[in-house]
Curated annotation (Swiss-Prot):
Family, similarity comment: Belongs to the universal ribosomal protein uL15 family.
Entry keyword Ribosomal protein: yes
Composition skew (Basic residues), residue ranges: 30-39
Lineage: Bacteria, Pseudomonadati, Thermodesulfobacteriota, Desulfuromonadia, Desulfuromonadales
GO molecular function, one term: rRNA binding
HAMAP family the UniProt entry points to: Ribosomal_uL15
Function: Binds to the 23S rRNA.
The protein's name in its UniProt record: Large ribosomal subunit protein uL15
Listed transmembrane segments: none
Residue span of region Disordered: 1-62
Keywords attached to this entry: Ribonucleoprotein, Ribosomal protein, RNA-binding, rRNA-binding
GO cellular component, one term: cytosolic large ribosomal subunit
Protein's organism: Pelobacter propionicus (strain DSM 2379 / NBRC 103807 / OttBd1)
Amino acid sequence: MDLNTLKPALGSVKQGKRIGRGPGSGHGKTATKGHKGQKARSGGSIKAGFEGGQMPLQRRLPKRGFTPLSRVEYAIVNLKQLDAFEANSSVDTESLVAMGLVKSTACAVKILGNGDLAKSLRVSASKFSQSAKDKILAAGGTVEETV
């Protein structure tokens, strides 16, 4: 087998449509554009959202709300996921990234109280729900909110 003898599998490569190449091709003369009209002309594309002069939908509908610039997006971690850590270990953003529970150290982390925690852990995160705080402290762990 040589590189020059390699061929794609049968039926895997579809031949391109060759338009405007004579009547025998089936796509000659009007080259799949039909007869006359704006879309048959060169440069005859219509802008996205254009409705023939009628007021377009995106201008007919009112503007609604706004996006706050100071919005903070939190990565959510539940207590049942923290159960994977060893007892008395320290849980922070770096360790959560290492375990694959959070994508990056740049994102803020919020710990929620879904599930139970049987181990004592030192947990530091951006935010905690009240139930998560209570369960971590009840298990003998410590809670530290980072900014």
